[in-house]
Amino acid sequence: MSTKEKLIGHVMKEEPIGSRNKVTVVGVGMVGMASAVSILLKDLCDELALVDVMEDKLKGEAMDLQHGSLFLKTHKIVADKDYSVTANSRVVVVTAGARQQEGESRLNLVQRNVNIFKFIIPNIVKYSPNCILMVVSNPVDILTYVAWKLSGFPRHRVIGSGTNLDSARFRHIMGEKLHLHPSSCHGWIVGEHGDSSVPVWSGVNVAGVSLQTLNPKMGAEGDSENWKAVHKMVVDGAYEVIKLKGYTSWAIGMSVADLVESIVKNCTKCTQCPRWSRGMHGVKDEVFLSVPCVLGNSGLTDVIHMTLKPEEEKQLVKSAETLWGVQKELTL
């Protein structure tokens, strides 16, 4: 008898039930690993699978996490370039793709990443046909649409990280300006995750107090407090981080974990993810835009009907047109 057989006596004759909350992260770059670590630290899965085409880096990252498993509640961390390792995942997070370069807009990345998705998405579907598919790769709104088309999944099971991070940046900067914790500052960024995103100034509030009621010019030209600069800082934030450290990672990783938590814990929490938006607020094209929605264990279950001012609605339509201008040229 082996040491293991002498030590452990089996009670069950059949094989134990496998993972119930398996999460896969595709891509072990900076964003992928920040997402993986954030998911592990929040104890959101009982098994974590990592996939990448770069075998040495993949093996090294997996070993590094495994060596720290004593300090985590998730000890089963697996990795392989073969997608069979992802089988029966509850959530699959796709971070793989070409990295955004300094000064490069997210939309310029699109065709390079579409070609990568043509390999990734069918493999995910093959091994986890019932998963919730979460796209993080940029440009995330267009690639969420691409993932939906390539997967054949119903719309509620294909989401993106969207403007969840944009809104977090917005609330952080607002908090800095008001000397309050971001959780006390409420405001939404909708539309594209990127340059044409739309701040919903009419909904910005602290403790239910509308800031635009206190300052009717908030977010507009002629505002002596220049709140419009807050949104500019949100848009420029990623570019500034890339300029300073070469890439973004930690904030988007934490944002991804926040979305995964809403799914695996069935939080039914309001967040903002790209969803199919034709017919909403005057949007005419088949695009995915971030709007307030509800995430639970079935995916994106509900959408919140925002009350937008005419100018905000106009900006949202323009954001949709910006995405459609690129999306309609794609070869899927």
Curated annotation (Swiss-Prot):
Substrate binds at residues 106, 138, 169, 248. Interconverts simultaneously and stereospecifically pyruvate and lactate with concomitant interconversion of NADH and NAD(+). PROSITE patterns: L_LDH. NAD(+) binds at residues 29-57, 99, 138. Keywords: Cytoplasm, NAD, Oxidoreductase. InterPro entries: L-lactate/malate_DH, L-lactate_DH, L-lactate_DH_AS, Lactate/malate_DH_C, Lactate/malate_DH_N, Lactate_DH/Glyco_Ohase_4_C, NAD(P)-bd_dom_sf. Coiled coil: none annotated. Gene3D superfamilies: Lactate dehydrogenase/glycoside hydrolase, family 4, C-terminal, NAD(P)-binding Rossmann-like Domain. This is L-lactate dehydrogenase A chain. Its EC number is 1.1.1.27. GO terms for molecular function: L-lactate dehydrogenase activity. Homotetramer. It holds the Pfam family Ldh_1_N.
